[in-house]
Regions:
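C-terminal catalytic histidine-bearing segment of alpha/beta-hydrolase fold enzymes
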Residues: 165-171, 175-215
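Short beta-strand immediately N-terminal to the catalytic nucleophile in serine-hydrolase-like folds
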Residues: 101-103, 128, 154
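Short beta-strand/loop motif that positions the catalytic acidic residue
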Residues: 152-155, 159
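Active-site signature of alpha/beta-hydrolase-fold catalytic machinery across serine-
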Residues: 35, 113-117
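A conserved short beta-strand
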Residues: 120-132
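Serine-hydrolase catalytic machinery in alpha/beta-hydrolase-like enzymes
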Residues: 2-96
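Gly/Ala-rich beta-loop-alpha elbow adjacent to hydrolase catalytic centers
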Residues: 102-107, 111
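Flexible "cap/lid" loop of the alpha/beta hydrolase fold
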Residues: 59-67, 131-150
């Protein structure tokens, strides 16, 4: 039985061209990214804000991965729901090259883990304060087609939740795997950088202006 994620939408146009899936972090919900979407101020876009399907152990919010390191992790609902969401977006008329994923913290982890398993490339990934949690599984499951998906990694130098070293490690893994990546560091803690909204806007409008091709 397929799983549907609770999802809100926000559009900046009656005929949007680009679709952006905004993936909240740990304990977040489908409302936390809307203000960020408005600050990015992207024309001709439709935003999709899904809610993570699992509750945190403390029951204070939502999580994309259920369980823990000792008992094991559950993520079937997450990947099933994300697959259904991206398929609906494509069926509604968006080309894969105009679909972007943006995620923060645990949401950035999911954006990378999910998008790079797809049997096709998408417009791009923006991973803020992210990391690769399941490295061995990622290295095994990442598809050749997904290496054409440009990636913008962003990480605060003073991040005390997910250290910037995790962002650097993620960058190194992706580059070694053949992905085109730009790693942007900024002076902040564990937060979405308001001063980098223009960079995100520019990346979504033209990823090649940020992520340079190797050829």
């Amino acid at each position: 039985m397929s799983f549907e994620l609770i999802t809100r939408t926000y559009s900046t146009s009656q005929k949007p061209i680009k679709a952006i899936i905004a993936i909240h972090g740990w304990e977040g919900d489908e409302y936390v990214f809307e203000q960020v979407a408005k600050l990015i101020s992207l024309e001709n876009s439709e935003w999709f804000f899904p809610r993570a399907p699992y509750r945190t152990d403390s029951d204070n919010g939502n999580s994309w991965f259920g369980g823990n390191d000792e008992d094991g992790w559950k993520f079937e609902k997450t990947f099933d729901g994300m697959n259904n969401l991206i398929n609906k977006i494509r069926t509604s008329g968006y080309s894969a090259s105009n679909i972007f994923l943006i995620g923060f913290s645990q949401g950035a982890c999911l954006a990378i883990d999910f998008a790079l398993r797809l049997p096709f490339s998408i417009g791009g990934i923006i991973a803020i304060a992210g990391f690769i949690k399941f490295k061995e599984r990622f290295l095994k499951d990442a598809t050749k087609e997904s290496t054409r998906t440009p990636i913008l990694l962003m990480h605060g130098n003073q991040d005390d939740v997910i250290p910037v070293k995790a962002g650097k490690t993620t960058n190194d893994i992706l580059v070694e795997k053949g992905y085109l990546v730009h790693f942007e560091r900024y002076d902040a803690k564990h937060k979405i950088p308001l001063k980098k909204m223009n960079l995100i806007n520019k990346f979504i409008n033209d990823p090649t202006s940020i992520v340079k091709s190797k050829t």
